């Protein structure tokens, strides 16, 4: 079964420590910040209040993990899993960044350090989706994706959301009607001081849709319904199809 969970792992300069998938499941809905680390959630709440009282807003990040995705979904080029996933995540309003696996840290790794070693699965890792004897990575620095294709290991990454732009704090801008510079422009009304807590279910939904797309593309769900259809949904054609493994 595919299981997906996300949580807020950073608000401004307050960042949660690394937590397990189980901790995300257990704690992320216990607080209004939707952070899976209760102690950090309290600090985030205090920091959000500070910005709200100042009439300002703050950005943050959402961490996600996907388990149960079978190996072999995706393709090396136009149907690369991470490309479709990136498109889905960048479609979430206010998103300014998306990364998976090592993400930006990969820039500091050598090829030898970053390359995941592979082995033959012995059935001893609960988080792996593979049959005994099938090749799987030993580590998961690639975030469950290599060369556009799922490896059977958990897919994980992070989405960055910018601070809400509508704030009551006075700002300098240009008035199109008067063609004058305004030094005290204000947005009047209700203002969200932060977006990641609202973005968690959106990110989870986009993850589910992306995984479902690839399950359909690869004929992993009801293949008899799409075999006779032309184009990318032809399971004889698509690289994700079990027939092409």
Please give the residue ranges for each predicted region.
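Glycine-rich anion/phosphate-binding loop at the beta-strand->alpha-helix junction
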Residues: 54-182
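Predominant activation on well-ordered alpha-helical scaffold segments within soluble catalytic domains
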Residues: 45, 83-90, 156-158, 200-213
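Generic secondary-structure signature for well-ordered alpha-helical cores
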Residues: 1-2, 49, 53-56, 90, ...
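Short, charged low-complexity intrinsically disordered segments located at boundaries
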Residues: 19-24, 74-78, 115-122, 237-245
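Glycine-rich and small/hydrophobic secondary-structure elements
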Residues: 27-36, 155, 206, 211
């Amino acid at each position: 079964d595919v299981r997906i969970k996300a949580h807020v792992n950073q608000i401004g300069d307050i960042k949660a420590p690394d937590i397990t998938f189980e901790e995300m499941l257990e704690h992320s809905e216990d607080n209004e910040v939707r952070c899976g680390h209760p102690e950090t959630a309290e600090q985030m709440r205090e920091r959000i209040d500070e910005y709200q009282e100042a009439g300002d807003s703050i950005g943050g990040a959402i961490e996600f993990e996907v388990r149960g995705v079978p190996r072999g979904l995706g393709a090396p080029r136009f149907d690369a899993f991470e490309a479709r996933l990136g498109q889905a995540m960048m479609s979430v309003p206010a998103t300014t960044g998306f990364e998976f696996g090592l993400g930006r840290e990969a820039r500091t790794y050598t090829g030898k350090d970053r390359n995941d070693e592979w082995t033959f699965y012995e059935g001893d890792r609960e988080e792996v989706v593979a049959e005994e004897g099938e090749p799987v990575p030993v580590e998961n620095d690639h975030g469950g994706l290599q060369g556009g294709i799922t490896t059977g290991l958990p897919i994980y990454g992070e989405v960055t959301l910018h601070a809400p732009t509508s704030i009551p704090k006075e700002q300098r801008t240009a008035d199109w009607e008067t063609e004058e510079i305004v030094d005290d422009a204000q947005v009047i009304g209700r203002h969200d001081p932060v977006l990641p807590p609202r973005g968690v279910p959106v990110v989870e939904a986009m993850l589910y849709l992306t995984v479902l797309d690839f399950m359909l593309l690869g004929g992993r769900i009801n293949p008899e319904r799409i075999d006779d259809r032309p184009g990318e949904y032809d399971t004889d054609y698509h690289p994700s199809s079990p027939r092409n493994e």
